[in-house]
Amino acid sequence: MLFIDTWGWLTLRDRREARHKDVKTFYQEVQKQKGRIYTTDYVLDETYTLLFKRLPYSVARESVERLNEAVLNGYLAIEWITPEQFEEAKKLRMKYQDKPRISFTDLTSIVVMNKLKIVNILTEDAQFI
């Protein structure tokens, strides 16, 4: 099982990203192995916003369509943040006083990963390392 965060999705689609080739190769390998990929609605919110902000419209639109196809084909699972998970993420926010830069979306991702027992994540964020 693999969780992909916003950075992973953006780097996969943006050829200008320094790690684009590495991420694309890794993603294709996971696909070949029929690995299950997870993300959340919060991650996709960030991803869709940034795709259309950073990339030409046609590339951003194709990216969203590919994500939708992955969901329809059962390759990508979207975990929808529940009110309970939202509350748990709020508790984490209060707990990690020493990490003011961690986003609330990242905290919800941590909650979901813990629930699903996912240990592998495609990210550049230090808090997941």
Where are these regions (language model features)?
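Short, well-structured N-terminal submotif of metal-dependent ribonuclease cores
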Residues: 1-39, 52-66
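Short beta-strand scaffold positions
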Residues: 4, 38-39, 80, 104, ...
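Ribonuclease/tRNase effector modules and their secretory precursors
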Residues: 21-22, 70, 75-78, 122, ...
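A generic structural signal for short hydrophobic patches within well-formed alpha-helices
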Residues: 9, 44, 128-129
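Active-site neighborhoods of divalent-metal-dependent phosphate/nucleic-acid chemistry enzymes
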Residues: 76-120
